[in-house]
Amino acid sequence: MTKNKKIIFVFIVLIFILLMLFIAKTRRENKIEYPEFETNGQSIYLPTYIPDGYSVKSVRVSDGMTTAEFTDGSEVICFVEIRSTDVSIDIDDEDYETKKAELGSKYGFLSEWDDRKIFTYTDEISTVSISGKLKNKEIEKIVKSIKLYS
């Protein structure tokens, strides 16, 4: 094998290793195993990522609204998707701090009190709310992971 062929071979092996690492990381992040539930014929969106230690507590689908709860045994993360863009968002500044925020490439409102947060945004098809004892980075990961459930 010539020197150039060895360099090309090593380069291809490195690319292959990086690709395998990327695939392994992607599979770890898409780890939610949802129990079987009735979608009532609706197209619904759910996160494919939740923080480590959490599992699905419940999923409910009814008349244009999907609610999923995740728990780690003591804390709960709540995901709500309402299939409407005409939902008004009530901002209560007296009980907790609320500000405009961009998380996971979505613009919305982030409310904080103690160590709990609620991030609510509206996109082209729905209004989504994610709440729980979460850091902003975790909310971003959840937002970016929301996909059509199939």
Regions inferred by a protein language model and the residue ranges of each:
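Positively charged n-region of N-terminal signal peptides that target proteins for export
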Residues: 1-7
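Short, flexible turn/loop "capping" segments at secondary-structure junctions
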Residues: 119-124
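Coil-to-beta-strand transition motifs
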Residues: 75, 125-127
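Hydrophobic membrane-insertion alpha-helices, especially the h-region
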Residues: 9-23
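Surface-exposed amphipathic alpha-helical segments
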Residues: 127-150
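Short, solvent-exposed recognition patches
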Residues: 25-118
